[in-house]
């Protein structure tokens, strides 16, 4: 027997200050009544054959976003329900020079998520950026 009394997932953004609004930054996200949680491993600019990109930061950001979208959609989840996005990069300065690509993607897909950006010494092979997400439904 199945219970047909489904509750709708609720997502609440917590922003106690105003400064983060101009940066597409969210201080916290509260989620209630979830049906499932998807923990997405770090997605990078690796092609369908498993080859790591040696392209510039801008190109790798675009490819990493495409791969992240593919995993999320293949899992039956929606981009707008990303609640956490961690960004790892080997160069914060290069990442922030191209950060508008990520901000525009977030706005276009109505994503409001908690985030952390970390500069790391290295990523796999020739990769310079990695996107790790948590998605709910």
Spans of features found by a protein language model:
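N-terminal presequence-like segments and the immediate start of the first folded domain
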Residues: 1-66, 70-83, 89-137
């Amino acid at each position: 027997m199945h219970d047909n009394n489904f509750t709708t997932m609720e997502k609440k953004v917590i922003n106690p200050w105003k400064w983060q609004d101009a940066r597409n930054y969210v201080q916290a996200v509260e989620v209630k009544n979830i049906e499932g949680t998807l923990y997405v491993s770090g997605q990078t600019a690796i092609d369908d054959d498993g080859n790591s990109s040696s392209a510039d930061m801008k190109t790798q950001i675009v490819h990493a976003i495409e791969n992240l979208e593919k995993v999320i959609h293949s899992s039956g989840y929606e981009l707008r329900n990303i609640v956490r996005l961690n960004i790892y990069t080997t160069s914060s300065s290069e990442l922030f020079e191209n950060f508008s690509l990520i901000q525009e993607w977030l706005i276009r897909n109505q994503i409001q998520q908690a985030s952390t950006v970390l500069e790391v010494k290295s990523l796999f092979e020739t990769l310079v950026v990695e996107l790790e997400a948590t998605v709910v439904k």
